[in-house]
């Protein structure tokens, strides 16, 4: 600093050393053009001095013998050099990527035993029990690394955060078509881990998270972000989940993503997706080009929500299936939807081909709007308006669209109030219709007249391959036509024969034959879904045929439509072969797997225990889990950790996954830590309140990506000792390849089963694993177990002391209350006995009786008069007997009153009185406070 100051002062004053100035040959450079670049004499002298100074400094610095010596003069010409950039980098590594993205090794073989061992060791490290259903499914994995495994299901099991983390050992080695976490009570931590694994490992094509109401905003945010970045995920089932105002923006952000995510099917049944939430979602889906199927059933949609559906139909160009079952849209909402179908944008750009309006309080009044929409919009192929009170009026208004329609293939009219008159109108429509493939008119009061009309219509129809009608229509209601019973049954069977005839005709038109010159065997492929098409026109697959998870009777109906002939080998005959377009569609449909619900004409509920599930999910179960975990003993923990690794699971059959498919129906047993008087529903609604201890040292769970867990919101950067079990996991073989693991910014601490909570701030005592190189010694294991046992013993002693003091206080209170109650009862009893057994005076009673008869008044109440009687007879003997009987009855009542009540009942009554007094005092105080405020306000507001 001082050197720069002196140099600047020297330049300002022009003071230089004499020898240096004299020896300097530098001179100012004259300007090239004196006329244009004339410099005043003062500036010329200053520039000359500056040049002399720079030259002198350069000579002085260059003439030094020691380059590392002390610099005595300033030089602005010195430079700083650095080594080459490549020499600065000592090493680097690529960003972590999953095994399935980094390379493709065709020689790799999936080893089920290795996956099973890794999964068990992961469960052991995280102090949790492995799932028996998962172990069975691991044994069923095929060995091809190029093909995804079919299914990983934990349906109906309680999955904790530790168990979810242990599943990473499976996800890092195997990919699946379907991952089913239905009804597994996932929370935010489980959802965050699952979302990160799905995004990193690209684990599945279809993901089922239905019936999980404990997931909140943090979990949904991670799930939706992972789905937005997932490459293969196509179907997401969020049925009966807790989507609220805070989590819906994350869903909308995923829907607005450009380019659109790979998601094509979204189930949002019973997620409160109505009103504002529905409007926000539809605004996000306006420009979405990837979604094909949207399920919005059981959301309580109102007629006003029909305008939101109108915006979705007119703006979205990729949606093919819209399911609105079990709502309350009504006639006005249906009119809004029909206006959207008739809109010019929808007619030109919309891809909507299937719509489900099952059970929406629709009547026949809105069927004229629906008929006009079907006439103008020629893209609707499947329409299900079942379970609505349409009646004959609705069918009559729908008749113009059904008679002239050439594009509607499937019509659902189940339980719509169609009688014989409606069946006759419907028969008139289908007689000449060449587009309908399936009509469902089950659960309607159709009798013999309707059956005859449908029989005549099906005799002329050439397109319908399946007509669903109840067999009860054949039953005769009159004895006069009993002799025609066999004939009516024959008509019913002939309807099925006509359907089979139409199916065979379509198959014949879709097949071609050729001469087999090389002698290869000929194979005829037939598919009922393909026979539902037009002649040789390549139609687009409708969602109703490629739906997931149909009910039992629906599967039977679909199977009736499908006919596959066995391969026949004949070298001399002609071999029929399906057309190329049909073959491609057949293979495409065979690859599509059924997963959840059916969107075809049958909309009955497929979950048989849905009411039990809803009752179980009505309250939070974290308190139950905490109580059960806290009550687990060390012996139970050792049994969970010492899992037999030698047993290899056998191959799975159809019933091997029965454990995971069962729904949780067991009642939870609460240990001594919880009161047994409370029912299950009340325990489900209570929050988790860990016990407090005097010395509290909150220990922290460190979560990846800096996410905060609601169960432990107190954080500490200090690490704790590592927790290891006696049965240490076997080391990984040296020849095994280290699989890449998804990145985690922070370590995760998993609580040990049986650990006690510590701290008044309800932060649980959690041991965080310290992943270090090298094996775990026996000394570390013994120290850890000793510390845990000491902590448990100390906590038990504190609890015993607190319980002892509480018992003593309660005992004193009970003794005092019992004494007060007994003394009061005894005083009352003595008074009553004294009054009752006092000697009666007959003369006085007779005098009072005569006086009452003269005046017409009733007998006065005296201590000698019994309370139960109001009249005294004038017979002395009867009076004596009467008084003796009254005294005996009163004595018996007092004895029963004294002996009937137990100590517990007395305590309960006293406690009720105390609580009632406290509440009454608070009520009076609140009332007086309000009165004072009113008086104060009235005085302040009164005019002066």
UniProtKB/Swiss-Prot annotation:
Each LRR repeat, start to end: 203-224, 232-255, 262-282, 290-311, 318-338
Signal sequence, renumbered to the chain: none
Biased segments, Polar residues type: 543-554, 567-585
Region (Disordered): 42-71, 517-598
SUPFAM superfamilies, alphabetized: RNI-like (SSF52047)
InterPro entries: Leu-rich_rpt (IPR001611), LRR_dom_sf (IPR032675), PP1-Reg/Actin-Interact_Protein (IPR051279)
Ranges of compositional bias, category Basic and acidic residues: 522-542
Keyword Plastid tagged: no
Compositional bias ranges of the Basic residues kind: 586-595
Pfam families in UniProt: LRR_6
Entry-linked CDD domains: LRR_RI
Family: Belongs to the PPP1R37 family.
Descriptive protein name: Protein phosphatase 1 regulatory subunit 37 homolog
């Amino acid at each position: 600093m001082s050197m720069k100051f002196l140099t600047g002062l020297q330049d300002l004053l022009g003071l230089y050393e004499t020898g240096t100035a004299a020896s300097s040959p530098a001179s100012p450079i004259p300007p090239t053009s004196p006329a244009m670049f004339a410099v005043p004499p003062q500036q010329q002298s200053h520039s000359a001095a500056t040049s002399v100074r720079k030259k002198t400094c350069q000579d002085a610095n260059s003439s030094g013998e020691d380059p590392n010596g002390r610099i005595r003069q300033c030089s602005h010409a010195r430079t700083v050099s650095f080594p080459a950039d490549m020499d600065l980098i000592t090493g680097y590594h690529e960003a972590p990527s999953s095994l399935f993205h980094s390379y493709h090794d065709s020689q790799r073989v999936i080893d089920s035993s290795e996956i099973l061992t890794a999964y068990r060791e992961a469960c052991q490290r995280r102090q949790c029990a492995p799932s028996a259903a998962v172990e069975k499914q691991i044994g069923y994995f095929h060995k091809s690394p190029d093909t995804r495994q079919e299914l990983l299901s934990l349906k109906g099991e309680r999955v904790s955060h530790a168990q979810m983390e242990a599943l990473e050992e499976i996800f890092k080695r195997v990919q699946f078509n379907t991952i089913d976490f239905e009804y597994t009570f996932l929370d935010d931590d489980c959802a965050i881990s699952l979302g990160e694994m799905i995004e990193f490992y690209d684990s599945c094509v279809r993901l089922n998270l239905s019936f999980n109401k404990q997931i909140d905003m943090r979990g949904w945010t991670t799930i939706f972000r992972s789905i937005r970045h997932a490459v293969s995920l196509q179907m997401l089932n969020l049925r009966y989940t807790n989507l609220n105002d805070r989590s819906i923006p994350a869903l909308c952000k995923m829907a607005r993503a450009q380019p659109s995510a790979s998601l094509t099917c979204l189930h949002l049944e019973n997620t409160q997706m109505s009103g504002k939430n529905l409007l926000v979602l539809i605004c996000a889906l306006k420009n979405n080009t990837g979604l094909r199927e949207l399920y919005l059933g059981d959301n309580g949609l109102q007629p006003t929500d029909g305008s939101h559906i109108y915006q979705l139909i007119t703006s979205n160009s990729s949606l093919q299936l819209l399911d609105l079952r079990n709502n309350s849209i009504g006639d006005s909402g249906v009119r809004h939807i029909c206006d959207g179908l008739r809109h010019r944008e929808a007619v030109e750009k919309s891809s909507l081909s299937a719509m489900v309006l099952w059970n929406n309080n629709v009547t026949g009044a809105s069927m004229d709007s629906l008929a006009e929409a079907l006439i103008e919009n020629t893209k609707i192929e499947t329409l299900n308006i079942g379970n609505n009170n349409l009646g004959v009026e609705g069918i009559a208004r729908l008749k113009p669209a059904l008679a002239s329609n050439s594009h509607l293939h499937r019509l659902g009219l189940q339980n719509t109030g169609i009688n014989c008159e409606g069946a006759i109108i419907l028969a008139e429509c289908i007689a000449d219709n060449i587009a309908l493939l399936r009509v469902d008119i089950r659960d309607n009061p159709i009798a013999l007249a309707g059956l005859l009309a449908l029989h005549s219509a099906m005799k002329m129809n050439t397109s319908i391959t399946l007509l669903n009608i109840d067999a009860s229509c054949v039953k005769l209601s009159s004895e006069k036509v009993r002799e025609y019973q066999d004939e009516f049954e024959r008509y019913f069977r002939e309807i099925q024969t006509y359907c089979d005839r139409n199916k065979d005709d379509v198959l014949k038109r879709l097949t071609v034959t050729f001469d087999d010159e090389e002698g290869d065997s000929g194979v005829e492929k037939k598919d009922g879904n393909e026979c539902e098409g037009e002649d040789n026109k390549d139609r687009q697959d409708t969602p109703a045929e490629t739906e997931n998870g149909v009910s039992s009777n629906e599967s039977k109906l679909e199977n009736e439509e499908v006919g596959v002939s066995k391969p026949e080998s004949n070298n001399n005959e002609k071999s029929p072969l399906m057309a190329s377009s049909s073959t491609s569609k057949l293979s495409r449909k065979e690859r599509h797997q059924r997963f959840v619900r059916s969107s075809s004409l049958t909309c009955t509920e497929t979950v048989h225990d849905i009411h039990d599930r809803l009752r179980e999910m009505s309250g939070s179960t974290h308190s139950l889990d905490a109580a059960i975990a806290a009550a687990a003993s060390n012996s139970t923990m050792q049994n969970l950790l010492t899992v037999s690794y030698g047993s290899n699971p056998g191959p799975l059959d159809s019933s091997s996954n029965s454990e995971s498919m069962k729904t949780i129906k067991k009642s939870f047993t609460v240990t001594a830590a919880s009161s047994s008087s409370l029912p299950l529903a009340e325990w489900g609604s209570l929050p988790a309140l860990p016990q407090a201890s005097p010395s509290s040292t909150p220990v922290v769970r460190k979560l990846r990506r800096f996410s905060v867990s609601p169960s432990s919101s107190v954080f500490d950067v200090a690490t704790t000792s590592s927790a290891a079990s006696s049965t240490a996991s076997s080391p990984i073989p040296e020849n095994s390849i280290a699989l890449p693991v998804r990145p985690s910014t922070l370590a995760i601490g998993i609580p040990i089963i049986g650990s006690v909570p510590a701290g008044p701030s309800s932060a649980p005592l959690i041991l965080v694993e310290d992943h270090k190189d090298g094996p775990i010694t026996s000394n570390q294991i013994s120290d850890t177990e000793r510390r845990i046992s000491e902590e448990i013993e100390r906590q038990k002693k504190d609890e015993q002391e607190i319980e002892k003091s509480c018992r003593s206080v309660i005992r004193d209170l009970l003794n005092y209350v019992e004494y007060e109650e007994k003394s009061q009862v005894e005083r009352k009893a003595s008074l009553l006995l004294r009054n009752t057994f006092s000697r009666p005076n007959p003369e006085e009673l007779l005098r009072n009786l005569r006086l009452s008869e003269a005046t017409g008044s009733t007998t006065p109440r005296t201590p000698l008069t019994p309370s139960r009687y109001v009249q005294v007879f004038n017979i002395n003997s009867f009076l004596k007997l009467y008084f003796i009987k009254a005294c005996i009855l009163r004595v018996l009542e007092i004895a029963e009153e004294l002996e009937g009540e137990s100590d517990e009942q007395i305590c309960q009554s006293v406690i009720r009185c105390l609580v009632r007094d406290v509440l009454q005092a608070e009520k009076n105080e609140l009332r007086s406070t309000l009165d004072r405020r009113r008086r104060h306000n009235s005085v302040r507001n009164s005019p002066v």
